[in-house]
C-alpha cells in the first residue's frame, strides 16, 4: 500500500514527443488535463535568459529559441553517444549534444546566460516533474508514487535510466511497465463486458519516436504477453523528417537556397510539416504556407497524401516486420489473432492502418480505445493495483510480461551462451553451471550481454565482473554457478558462486558505461530542487509584478469614473495620478526587478491612494481630518522620493 498522506499513485506515459498522466479515482481512470486544458503535454523543456519552461510553454516558443529547447530525450536515454542512432539524430536536432564521461551523451543549452549540460535523464525528469505537478494540481495533494511506462523493446540500460529520471523528479517509481502491455490493460477493461474465454490480442503501438508490437493472451483478467518485438527508433518524428527533407529540396530547387543550416527556418518548417501530416490523415491534400521562411522568401507549397505515403513507404513497410516476428516468436498464425489494437498517434495514418489490415487479410482493426491515452490509462490501473487503491474490478488483474531480448554471457572463444531467451515471462531466475577454461585458472570474468546474435561482439555488453579466489585445479573441474535474475521491471541481477569455496560475487546490471552513479543522481535531485525553487521565485516575481500593474491601471480607471471623479478634490486627484504615472513608468524601466521590489512599490502606491479613496468614501468633513491625520506617516512620506514603505516596514 502507498503510505497515507502521499496521495494516490499515478500512471505516467513518458513519451518521446508527448506525455500523459492518469489516476484511478471513483472506480475509473481519470486522464488529467494540464493547465492549458490539454490531456497530453509535449515532452519539451525550454531554457531562456530568465526561466525554464516545460510542456506546452516550451513547445510554443521553440521557433524563437530552437537551440535551447530540448525534446526527444527518450531517443537519447540509456544510449551511448557513439550509438549510430544517436549520431543520425544529432544531425537533425537543433540543440547541441556532446560526448560526456563514459561516452554518455550530454545536452548543452544556454540558461540564464550560462552554458549548462544535462543528461537525458535530467531532461526526462523535468517532464516527469511536470506530469507529477499536473496530477497534484488536479488532486490537490502531493504525489510520491508512480508507475512509468517504457517501450517494450527498451533494453536494460534504457529502463534503468528511465527509473533514474523518476528518482531525480522526486518520484518513487513503483514499477516500470511496457507501453503495449499498459495499452492492453486499457483494451482489456474496455472490452471486459463482452469477452468470454481466451483472446489473442496484438497491440500495434506506433508513437512519436518508438514502435512496439506485443502479442498477448487475455483471459479472465490475466494478461499474458506471448511475444514482443519493435524498434526503439521509429515513429512519427521520422515521418516528419522525410517531409521536412522533401520541402528543403523543393525550396532549394525553387529558390536556389539551402535552409538546412538555419535552425529557426527548419523548426518552422517542421512545425508546418507536423500539422500537414495530421491533416493528411483526414484529407487527400493540404497546403503549407510559411511567410518569410528564409531570407525574406515566403514558402507556399502543397503535398498530397499519396506523396506523403511515397516519402515514407519504406518506413511504413518496416512497421510490418516486427508484427511478423512477433507472431513467429509466439508460434501463432495470424488467423488466430482475435483483435488488432491501435495505440499511439501515428496509427492514425491511413496507410499504416491499410498495410496492417491487409497483413491480417482485411480484418477490421480495433479503434475503440484512445490511441493517445491508452498507455497512461493502463499505467494508472497498474498504479492502483500496486498501491491497493483499485476496486475488485482491477485488483484481480494479473500482468505477465516478458523480457524483449535474450540475456547470456560470453564463453570461451567469444560465443554467446543464452541463459534467458527472449520473450521469457518475468520475473524469472535461471541458473547454469560453468567451469574454467585453463588449468589452475585463479578467476573467471563474467561478461553479461543482451541480444540475439551468436557472437557476443555483435550483442550489447551490459556489464562485467570478476569472480576470483578459485583454488588451483585442472581445467573443467571448478564448478561456478551463474544465476540470472530479472525483476518485474525487467532489470537484471547477475551473481556467480564458486561451489567449492563458496566465493560469491554479484552485479546489478546497470550498464556501467552510461549509468548515473548514486552521487550523480543525488546531485541531480538537488539541482532539480534548485531549478524548481528558481521557477517558483520567478512565478512569485511575475505575480507581484502583475499585482502592481493591475492595481495601478485599476486605480487609474477608478478615478476616471465620473461618480468618483466628482468627489475627489483636484489636489487629491493629482496626487493619485502622479503616483500612478510614476509607478507605471517605474514598471516599464524595471521589468526585471525582484518580487520584494514590486511589493514595496505596491505598498508605496497603496499608501498614497488608499487613504484618499477611504477619505472619499467617508465623505464627511469630520471624518476627513481624522483620516488625514491617521495615515499621514505613510501618506506624506510616500509622496516624497518613495521612502514610504521603508517607514511602514519598521513596525
Curated annotation (Swiss-Prot):
Gene3D superfamilies linked:
1.20.1270.10, 3.30.30.30, 3.30.420.40, Actin, Chain A, domain 4, Substrate Binding Domain Of DNAk, Chain A, domain 1
Which residues constitute the signal peptide according to the record? Answer: none
**InterPro entries for the chain:** ATPase_NBD (IPR043129), Heat_shock_70_CS (IPR018181), HSP70_C_sf (IPR029048), HSP70_peptide-bd_sf (IPR029047), Hsp_70_fam (IPR013126)
PROSITE patterns for the chain? HSP70_1, HSP70_2, HSP70_3
According to the record, the residues making up region (Disordered) are: 619-651
Q: Which UniProt keywords apply?
A: ATP-binding, Nucleotide-binding, Stress response
Q: What induces it?
A: By cadmium.
Q: Name one GO molecular function term.
A: ATP-dependent protein folding chaperone
Q: Which Pfam family is an annotated match for this chain, by its short name?
A: HSP70
The similarity comment for this entry is: Belongs to the heat shock protein 70 family.
Supply the name of the protein. Heat shock cognate 70 kDa protein
Q: Which gene encodes it?
A: HSP70
